[in-house]
From Swiss-Prot:
Pfam families for the chain: DUF4434
One GO term (biological process): secretion by cell
Assigned GO CC terms: cell outer membrane
Keywords: Signal
Signal peptide coordinates: 1-20
UniProt xrefs under InterPro entries: DUF4434
Protein name listed in UniProt: Uncharacterized protein YbcH
Species, as recorded: Escherichia coli (strain K12)
Length: 296
């Protein structure tokens, strides 16, 4: 009987639910510097009370933003406060605002660009590995994988080479999981999109799929077909988890967004994968608990 109980406890301890993440993504912006330390610490404590276990920094550099010493120091302080509140920390690396424009280059030019991007990511990883009072629990590649530019196997070879190298070299800096996110807009079939993510998964990089409900480019039924193909529990789906969008995008050319209604957000926050996949939310500033603290 004791042996049976021991085996049962062991299975529970190693079940996928023991490792599934409930994370909130914070997209650092310069205007967030107006938030006081007290406000931020209170917000991090509220996240823990609401069941979140992880804060994901979408990036720690965006173009030239967050390159000044005082900006970096503030990000370090924000990250340390999250860990002090009991949250794990996934550190986003370098984000290039022109990432999607560079994908239209020749294969050779694209390969050269992705190598430069990797060098910038490694610089951020080394910087944050040495940051005082912080121990990153994982790394997030801030570039996003779309379903337009990597449709053929030939076209995605530079992507896969880059991700293979990124996973290996970032892990050399700190042997923690490496993540990236992906989104779909109907440019591939659901099965084709699943195959793309299977190739990404094979590089060792964990991929999260954005649910697309905030940008609302596809119908709910169309989005569900993509999510079932890429992140479902009924079949071996390649995604490590789903990012649920907590915002409603505006209709203009310039991106604007507002939070979804509180009741809809509450329904999304209650979601949990039935097979232990990660559940993430974008983004912190749209959570009701962040209203009056982070502008949107």
């Amino acid at each position: 009987m004791r042996k049976f109980i021991f085996v049962l406890l062991t299975l529970l301890l190693v079940s996928p639910f023991s490792f599934a993440m409930k994370g909130i993504i914070w997209q650092p912006q310069n205007r967030d510097s107006q938030v006081t330390d007290t406000q931020w610490q209170g917000l991090m404590s509220q996240l823990r009370l609401q069941g979140f276990d992880t804060l994901v920094l979408q990036w720690t550099r965006y173009g030239d933003a967050f390159t000044q010493p005082e900006q970096r120091t503030l990000l370090f302080k924000r990250a340390a406060a999250a860990q002090q509140a009991g949250l794990k920390l996934i550190v986003g690396l370098n984000a290039d605002p022109e990432f999607f424009m560079h994908q239209k280059q020749s294969s050779a030019a694209l390969e050269s660009y992705l190598n430069r991007l990797l060098a910038a990511d490694l610089q951020q990883a080394r910087l944050w590995s040495a940051a005082p009072g912080i121990t990153p629990d994982g790394w997030y590649i801030s570039a996003e994988i779309d379903d337009l530019n990597w449709r053929s196997e030939a076209a995605r070879q530079p992507l896969l080479t880059w991700l293979n190298n990124a996973q290996r070299l970032i892990s050399d800096v700190s042997a923690k999981p490496v993540y990236i996110s992906s989104f779909f807009a109907g440019n591939m079939s659901p099965d084709g999109y699943r195959q793309l993510l299977e190739h990404v998964k094979a590089t060792g990089v964990n991929v999260w799929v954005q649910d697309g409900s905030g940008v609302d480019k596809l119908t709910a039924e169309q989005r569900e077909r993509y999510l079932q193909a890429s992140a479902d529990c009924q079949s071996p789906a390649p995604a490590s988890g789903v990012v649920y969008e907590l915002f409603v995008a505006g209709k203009g050319k310039t991106f604007t967004a507002k939070p979804k209604p509180d009741a809809e957000i509450a329904s999304l926050l209650a979601k949990r994968s039935s097979c232990g996949k990660d559940t993430l939310y974008f983004s912190l500033r749209y959570l009701p608990v962040a209203h009056g603290i982070l502008e949107y």
